[in-house]
C-alpha cells in the first residue's frame, strides 16, 4: 500500500512564508477583466489618439490587428491584449488614456476660467489686468486696456457688449497658446 503524503503546513512564524501575499482567484479574474476592458478602450481609439499612448511594438501590433478583426476573432484578440498588459506597467497607459478621454472636460474648464478672468478684468480694471499680464506676459496691455474701458462703458449704457466678446476672444488666444 502506498504511503500518503502529509499536507504542507504553513508556518506563520517563518519570515520567508510571512511575506507571501495571498490573492484570490476572483481578484485575479477581476484584474484580468479590467485589463481586457482597458485594451478594448484603446482598440476603439482613432489612429491619432493611439499615437499619444506609450505602447511597445508588440502591443501596438496586437491593437492594430484587433482594430481590423470582427466578432469572435476580435474577442480572442482582446483577451490576448489583456494578457500582454499583465506583463507590463499599465499606469502610464491609463494616464495617457485619461488625458485623451478628459480632454473635453479640460477644455470646458479652461473656457470657464477665461470667462471668469474676463469678468474680473471688467470689474476690477487695471489691477486685474496687471495680475493677468504677470501670468501671461505676451498679452497686449494697451489693446486689453482699451477693450476693458469700452466694455465698462457698454455696461454702464446698457448697450450690447461687443468689447466684452472681443476681450473673451483675445484672452482665449492668449491663454490657450501657453
UniProtKB/Swiss-Prot annotation:
Belongs to the DarP family. This is Dual-action ribosomal maturation protein DarP. Member of a network of 50S ribosomal subunit biogenesis factors which assembles along the 30S-50S interface, preventing incorrect 23S rRNA structures from forming. Promotes peptidyl transferase center (PTC) maturation. CDD domains: YjgA-like. GO terms for biological process: assembly of large subunit precursor of preribosome. The keyword Heme does not apply. One of its GO terms (cellular component) is cytosol. It is found in: Cytoplasm. Keywords: Cytoplasm, Ribosome biogenesis, RNA-binding, rRNA-binding. Pfam families: DarP. One of its GO terms (molecular function) is rRNA binding. NCBIfam families: PRK05255.1-1. InterPro entries: DarP, DarP_sf. Its main location: cytoplasm. The gene is darP.
